[in-house]
């Protein structure tokens, strides 16, 4: 099993967006911002341990940071990783309903 300290570092925050809201309602899928070095097994274990739900599958994607301009200088935002966590039938997490209020 993963150490408790690592579990807390894997998941950073739920990712709330229009697409994430649709996935949560339609496909029982929750989207999280996760650590760049986290793998699918760690993400699944972290969600199961911290939220006490059963995970069906995990898909991950690295979102590349945008190039932004700050006056005359060019800068770049950091890359980050998000994970689409699909829960088993009958399981639910309600981050989206709490954010809508």
Curated annotation (Swiss-Prot):
Please provide, alphabetically and separated by semicolons, the GO molecular function terms listed in this UniProt record. rRNA binding; structural constituent of ribosome
InterPro entries the UniProt entry points to: Nucleotide-bd_a/b_plait_sf (IPR012677), Ribosomal_uL23-like (IPR013025), Ribosomal_uL23/eL15/eS24_sf (IPR012678), Ribosomal_uL23_CS (IPR001014)
Q: Which GO terms describe its cellular component?
A: ribonucleoprotein complex; ribosome
- Entry keywords, A to Z: Ribonucleoprotein, Ribosomal protein, RNA-binding, rRNA-binding
Q: Name one GO biological process term.
A: translation
Q: Which Gene3D superfamilies match?
A: 3.30.70.330
- Cited HAMAP family: Ribosomal_uL23_B
Q: Per the similarity annotation, which family is this?
A: Belongs to the universal ribosomal protein uL23 family.
Its job: One of the early assembly proteins it binds 23S rRNA. One of the proteins that surrounds the polypeptide exit tunnel on the outside of the ribosome. Forms the main docking site for trigger factor binding to the ribosome.
Q: Which PANTHER family match?
A: 60S RIBOSOMAL PROTEIN L23A
Protein name per its UniProtKB record: Large ribosomal subunit protein uL23
Annotated source species: Haemophilus ducreyi (strain 35000HP / ATCC 700724)
